[in-house]
Design a protein with these regions (language model features):
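Short, Gly/Pro- and small/polar-rich lid/capping loops
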Residues: 1-11
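N-terminal helical hairpins
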Residues: 16, 29-102
Length: 102
């Protein structure tokens, strides 16, 4: 079963000073990062960039993670172990961009 973690990278800073939040998907000891449409300012994260402090942002990201889990469980079920982290991320991306298209 994959695990998920919201991640912010220092080097992903926009010109307006905000940072894009990505979701790290780890499966079978391999990780991939899926970018989100969520951006945070320095005030909304800890100084070490490890934790998002803004609870509203955390709720939004948690909703995305729950959606990702539901997509995988509903469509792939117990076959998750057959896929790589990259394949799972690609599947989620395909499914979310086509609104249920897989």
């Amino acid at each position: 079963m994959p695990t998920y973690k919201p991640t912010v990278f220092k080097h992903h800073q926009r010109r307006d000073g905000k940072f894009r939040v990505s979701i790290r998907i780890t499966h079978n000891r391999k990780s991939v990062y899926m970018p989100t449409d969520v951006y945070v300012s320095r005030k909304q994260i800890t100084t070490d960039f490890k934790t998002i402090k803004d609870t509203e942002v955390v709720r939004m990201i948690d909703r995305d993670i729950i959606e990702y889990e539901n997509i995988l469980l509903r469509n792939l079920g117990s076959n998750l172990s057959q896929y790589t982290a990259r394949e799972l991320a690609d599947y989620i991306e395909k499914y979310t961009t086509t609104d249920g298209g897989a």
